[in-house]
Amino acid sequence: LIDVIRIPVPTSGNETQSKEALLNAIQTNSCAAFIFEPLVQGAAGMVMYTPEMLDELISICKTNDVFTIADEVMTGFGKTGKTFACDYLTQQPDMMCLSKALTGGTIPMAITTFTQQIFDGFYDDDTKKALFHGHTFTANPTGCAAALASLKWLQSTAMQSNIQRIHQKHLSFQNKIQTHPKVKTTRVLGVIFALEIQTENQESYYGTMRNKLYNFFIENGIILRPVGNIVYI
């Protein structure tokens, strides 16, 4: 299998370490691509970092001829306040992976997008250059119809207003809750709100707090999926 090199998430105070790790990985290895979740590391606990920092990382890759792949499966289609998290960037990725909210979560469907440069690399009469990749459900008519309906709704004035309304609600709640003694950190981006709970034994992502939180919400008629000691909406 191909080796995967991981770098630190470029959160506040960690920027230099992250850039140096990426540059070192490129200079000491034959790197095919830099794969990242833009602005929000979802399953890691909704860890957020700035567009400016990601721009710098992508710039390093472009300078060194390393392809960049944005995993927007979670962040895409309005989650961050814009259609894509990459819309906050100056530097754009070479590829994007999209799914989940593409169909409003109703039918499984995914899209991989490429720059024209990459597309042209496979567009040739010579079959040796073709990208022989496909699957049984390519261009599923029902999935495509659901995706078109979802995109139309996303672009509507009502949906865009709701995104802004939710974002402002999150900011207001953040101001109220962030000084609570049981709250360690809070963060907001678009319609994403994350709250990290302070625990006595400093449990985090892999602690037991997740089960306690999940059961508490279920008992109160609320369906949420805490990530460790982090509650997100």
Regions found by a protein language model. Give the residues of each.
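Conserved N-terminal phosphate-binding loop of PLP-dependent enzymes in the Aspartate aminotransferase
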Residues: 1-232
